[in-house]
Amino acid sequence: MSRYRGPRLKKIRRLGALPGLTRKTPKSGSNQKKKFHSGKKEQYRIRLQEKQKLRFHYGLTERQLLRYVHIAGKAKRSTGQVLLQLLEMRLDNILFRLGMASTIPGARQLVNHRHILVNGRIVDIPSFRCKPRDIITTKDNQRSKRLVQNYIASSDPGKLPKHLTVDTLQYKGLVKKILDRKWVGLKINELLVVEYYSRQT
């Protein structure tokens, strides 16, 4: 299944706020009428909805998300929390959380077009996994800096998660540590996502 490129408002009306996909938020009461199902069908619908929220927020294909679930499942810690940490430490998401892009798709374009350096080296893979002490910067040219300056200047410092720091004058971000669960940028029940996939096997 390919990455979603359709109307973004359609998705947030159905799933709720997806800040990684769009800055827009659903209007109160704009959700579609809920169809009430009984028992197993309703439980399945809720699990599916949480899975879709995760997928569209981080801009993943179904195959990519499934791969992350498998990797998280091999860890000794909580599968759900490891899954969120893996997704949050992707380079495209780190750029978004630093305020260098307005959305994750926007951050992905910066990476794909080779505007971003990690520890002084160009990285053009959006899924690149960042780690503590990584330094993220733009290339030292006017075009690269211009692409992020408006976003980074208008970003809200209060929304910057505690595992990151940003220097808005030098267009530079630092990953201080692996994030805590409470700093995940999406309202999500990750256990339902893990449950969804465990029932597919």
UniProtKB/Swiss-Prot annotation:
Gene3D superfamilies: Ribosomal Protein S4 Delta 41, Chain A, domain 1 (1.10.1050.10), RNA-binding S4 domain (3.10.290.10). This is Small ribosomal subunit protein uS4c. The lineage of its organism: Eukaryota, Viridiplantae, Streptophyta, Embryophyta, Tracheophyta. GO terms for cellular component: chloroplast; small ribosomal subunit. InterPro entries: Ribosomal_uS4, Ribosomal_uS4_bac-type, Ribosomal_uS4_CS, Ribosomal_uS4_N, S4_RNA-bd, S4_RNA-bd_sf. Keywords: Chloroplast, Plastid, Ribonucleoprotein, Ribosomal protein, RNA-binding, rRNA-binding. Residues 89-150 form the S4 RNA-binding domain. GO terms for molecular function: rRNA binding; structural constituent of ribosome. It comes from Sorghum bicolor. Its main location: plastid.
